[in-house]
């Protein structure tokens, strides 16, 4: 597998991956984290235009995963409840990680790629997104507390991995 920056001409394939991911979430007791429309086409386009969108390709160059990855400030991470972050250093963020239906190991590959690029990463997921929580723990992320999402008032479990 390989990782590269997503391009706008990848959009149709990326949207199919998210369609599968939303269906998978609903089938696995997590119908509300992304609902029926998140992320929107505009959100993915903005990821790509800002050079924050990445795709994972299998050995036949099929797109099998997508994620948003950048170094910056996530406003929703400014306040954390029922815990604390591992440190206050500059960090990278992973959002919107999604994997094609028939592929195993893609999520972990994407997470390891991100950590190879930046050694202090924060990420969040819904309390019912058990597969993602298990992936984060398997990849060495520590559960740090709860954050609130300003756009919808929802709560997410916050994770961090650092050297």
Say what each PLM segment does.
Residues 117-129:
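Conserved GNAT acetyl-CoA-binding A-motif
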Residues 124, 142-156:
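Conserved catalytic-core motifs of GNAT/GCN5-like acyltransferases
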Residues 23-43:
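Conserved GNAT-fold acetyl-CoA-binding loop/helix
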Residues 51-67:
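Conserved beta-hairpin
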Residues 99, 103-116, 134-138:
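Conserved acetyl-CoA-binding loop-helix of GNAT-fold acetyltransferases
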Residues 2-16:
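A short beta-loop-alpha structural element at the N-terminal edge
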Residues 68-98, 102:
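Conserved acyl-donor/pantetheine-binding loop and adjacent beta-alpha core of acyl/acetyltransferases
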Residues 45-55, 72-75:
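A short helix-loop-beta-strand connector motif used in the catalytic cores of GNAT acetyltransferases and
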